[in-house]
Structure formats: C-alpha cells, structure tokens
C-alpha cells in the first residue's frame, strides 16, 4: 500500500520538475499516447508469448527427450554394471575354486613326491644292502678260493717233499684198482 501512495507523489514531483527544466512526465494519458503504447506492448507480449511459447515448447520437448534418453542410457549402464558385477563375482568364485584346487593338487603332488622319494630311498637302501651282501659273498668266495688254492699248494708242496716214488706208485695202483671195480 505504501508503494501506491508513493507513485502519485513521484508523478507529481516529476511533473513539477519537468515544467521548470523542459523535460518531464506528462500526466495526461491521452496526450502522451500511453494507451497506444500499452496496446502495442500487450500486442507484442501476446505475439511474442505465442512465438516464444512454441520455441520454448520445442526446446522443452528436446530437453525432455534428451533427459529421457540419458535416463535410458543410465538404466542400460546400470544394467551392464550390475551384470559386470555379477560376472566379476562369479569370476572371483571360480578363481577361488581354482586356487583351492591348485593348493589341494600341490599338496597331493607334494605328498606323492615325498612318498615316492621315501620309496626310492627304501629301495636304494635295500639295493645297497643287497649289493653289499653280494660283494661280501664274492669277497668270501674269493678268500675261500684263495685259501683253498694256497692250502692245495701247500699240501702239494708238502706231498712232493714227503712223498717218495714208492708212495706215488701205490696211490696210482690204488686209483687204478678203484676204477677197475667201478667198470
């Protein structure tokens, strides 16, 4: 309400001021063509409203279409992201299973290698023991053969020294008689 009271006061001050300085506000509406100006202004607003309204409507439709397209792309991207997250989770599960299987397989292989190594060690120990026993038997045989050879040599030398030609003839005759009895 204060503004309405002030407007006539402002108009009065301007009209008084204009008469003194040759510039001012003409308060006669018909003389100042205020009605024509108002009609022109309302006509412009009406025409511009229709023109700008159609432009704004077209712009609004484009903006809404762009927003809808963006929302659709967002939904598609969200769906792809969700699918990718599912695939990542499945891949992670598969990776974990592969790791577990690899650990189990590595444990089995390690156990198998250790068991095979233990068997190889036992077999080598048995083979080594067998080789040692065989070597001992061969050495004993060689020693026995050497002892037998040396004993025979000694006996032969003693017999040659102690045996006379008469004893030799008796042994030969005795052997011939034994052979004759067998035939």
From Swiss-Prot:
Q: How does it sit in the membrane?
A: Single-pass membrane protein
The record's annotation in Pfam families points to:
ATP-synt_B (PF00430)
Q: Which InterPro entries match?
A: ATP_synth_b/b'su_bac/chlpt
UniProt-annotated location(s): Plastid, Chloroplast thylakoid membrane
Q: Name one GO molecular function term.
A: proton-transporting ATP synthase activity, rotational mechanism
Ranges that cross the membrane: 28-48
Indicate where this protein is primarily found.
plastid
**Keywords associated with the record:** ATP synthesis, ATP-binding, CF(0), Chloroplast, Hydrogen ion transport, Ion transport, Membrane, Nucleotide-binding, Plastid, Thylakoid, Transmembrane, Transmembrane helix, Transport
List the GO terms this entry assigns under cellular component, sorted alphabetically.
chloroplast thylakoid membrane; proton-transporting ATP synthase complex
The domain of life for this entry's organism is: Eukaryota
Instruction: Please share what else the UniProt entry notes about this protein.
Output: In plastids the F-type ATPase is also known as CF(1)CF(0).
Q: Which family does it belong to?
A: Belongs to the ATPase B chain family.
What is said about its interaction partners and assembly? F-type ATPases have 2 components, F(1) - the catalytic core - and F(0) - the membrane proton channel. F(1) has five subunits: alpha(3), beta(3), gamma(1), delta(1), epsilon(1). F(0) has four main subunits: a(1), b(1), b'(1) and c(10-14). The alpha and beta chains form an alternating ring which encloses part of the gamma chain. F(1) is attached to F(0) by a central stalk formed by the gamma and epsilon chains, while a peripheral stalk is formed by the delta, b and b' chains.
- What biological function has been recorded for the protein in this entry? F(1)F(0) ATP synthase produces ATP from ADP in the presence of a proton or sodium gradient. F-type ATPases consist of two structural domains, F(1) containing the extramembraneous catalytic core and F(0) containing the membrane proton channel, linked together by a central stalk and a peripheral stalk. During catalysis, ATP synthesis in the catalytic domain of F(1) is coupled via a rotary mechanism of the central stalk subunits to proton translocation.
Name of this chain's protein: ATP synthase subunit b, chloroplastic
The source organism is: Pyropia yezoensis
Name the gene behind this protein: atpF
